[in-house]
Amino acid sequence: LTEVHSQDPSLSSTERRKIAARSVEAINHAIRGIPAEKVRFHTCYGINEGPRVHAAPLPEIVDLILQVNAGAYAFEAANPRHEHEYHVWERVKLPAGKILIPGVITHYSNIVEHPELIAERILRYAKIVGRDNVIAGSDCGFSSQATYNPEVHPKVVWAKFQAMAEGARLASKQLWR
């Protein structure tokens, strides 16, 4: 859904949404017969460390994302281009029974996020959509496409995941006390 925006930024918002809506139809057709709770949909902006000035803002596409027949929605939320977009969930109601998987670690940087920052990111979402409706995730994968061309060194990736586990423990202590 986001690729339409970044691949041809000259398209109008209406044109981009029309193309993205066809993609949603195709996705739903492809997963027909699979219970929604068994489907996790990832909204991908791409893997590279580019400037992301043409990345689709979440408020412009959130309604389309929620039309995908999935039980959970994963999206970039830790990188500097999208971290502020958690506010969209203050205006958009998460449908009952659905789960958000916001990225709380990013593939855009070799910096290992601090567990306390990760906990804060988890808590932001939990406060808005409820603690039972959030699973911590990564913004995206850590290598380009299926060719294993790492942009973040594997040792750094493991350190990021360790920090995410610790951040989730910290958030859980606050959410379930």
What are these regions (language model features)?
Residues 1-177:
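Domain-level signal for soluble alpha/beta catalytic cores
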